[in-house]
C-alpha cells in the first residue's frame, strides 16, 4: 500500500468547503472517465471507458461535518475493492479566515505489486490534487 497527503487552503467557510468536498457525484466531474454515486453510507466511483473499467467501492466509516465557523469536519472512507483497497480521510478545519482541507489516502491497486507503490502515490497526488481544486472552485 502507498500513502499520500494533500493540503489545500481556500477562502471558503468550513461548512461550504465540506459541502463541496463531500458532494460525491461532483467527484465524477473532477476525475477523468469517472462517474460517482453514493447513498450516504456507500460511495462508488466507476472509472473506465465503455465496458472496460472498475468500481472503487467505499464505505463511509466516519461522518462528522463541521459545526459552525470554528468546527472541524472529518470523513473516513474505507475502500473495499475488488480492484482498489485502502482508505481516505478528509479533514476540513478553519484556517486564516477560510478553511483548509487535508486529504490523506492509503491505497493499493490490487493487480500491481509493491514495486509500483511510489508511482501510484505520485499519480494519486496529481489526480486528487486536481480533483480537490476542481471541487473547491465550485
Locate each region found by the language model:
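Ser/Thr-rich, low-complexity intrinsically disordered terminal regions
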Residues: 43-45
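Hydrophobic-ligand binding "helix-grip"
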Residues: 29-38, 49-100, 106-109, 137
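Hydrophobic ligand-binding cavity/cleft-lining segments
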Residues: 1-40
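A conserved amphipathic terminal alpha-helix motif
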Residues: 106-138
